[in-house]
Amino acid sequence: MTSVYHTPVLLEESVRLLDIDPAGTYVDLTFGGGGHSRRILSALGDRGRLYAFDQDRDTRDNCPEDSRFHYVESNFRFMRGALRLRGVTRVDGILADLGVSSHHFDAVERGFSFRGSAPLDMRMNQRGGGTAADLVNTLDADALTRILGDWGEIDTPWKVAACIVRARTAQPILTTADLVAAVAPCTPKKDESKFLTKLFQALRIEVNGEMEALKMALEQSLKVLRPGGRLVVISYHSLEDRLVKNFLRSGNFEGRIEKDFFGKPETPFEIITRKAVTPVSYTHLPSPRDKRQP
């Protein structure tokens, strides 16, 4: 199965910025095909440890046979609790490669791609939870409008929601092809791929609770990282980008800078740039796959 996973974007850059201590403890929040984990392991010594999270059971087949490696089959929103169960309270670095992997787009049967026809699933964790088909067939127009506007940043989400509601009254929307056909009346011909990318992104984020999971992981990172530890995040779209930047610059998701008694800004992280590396660090790396279409 490993062969169907592509080489991670910014592999060397992201691992280099972790500044790995060979005897340190590290977390890969998004194991996937294991590319980042294998690169981290190559920099660790015999005493080093790596904990890799993924809620998609398919990824278990990619686990390396290495006593320093510990696979955690869980959503990364439960990072702190899962680590504590394994006797880990502090780590030296955390890496997160956000969003959906190229494997999920390529595995058409999972329903992440609008190319072809497959069950409208979109669950990262296929063992439970509602599917994208459940959303589009049961939610009212107002709820669909919110999802499409908030998570897809679609210009006229109410029109798209109306198309979906109208189509499902004739027959259930069960496949990716059904959904593409349902929104055809409101799909701009000139920007069809861009529009469908936003539509599928919105539903995927809602199905998997991606933004809430990201918030929880970021908040927990403050309690899990040792002083001097590093958090490296690769993001793919503007929603993740804003959320991560706000939190790392201000310690909250609104971007509100708090000040101490003397008027000095209180920020939980210092930003890494290519010209300066600080003891407690964060780097935000925009990915070339920002514009990748499902």
Residue locations for each model-derived region?
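S-adenosyl-L-methionine-dependent methyltransferase catalytic core, i.e., the SAM/SAH-binding region
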Residues: 1-289
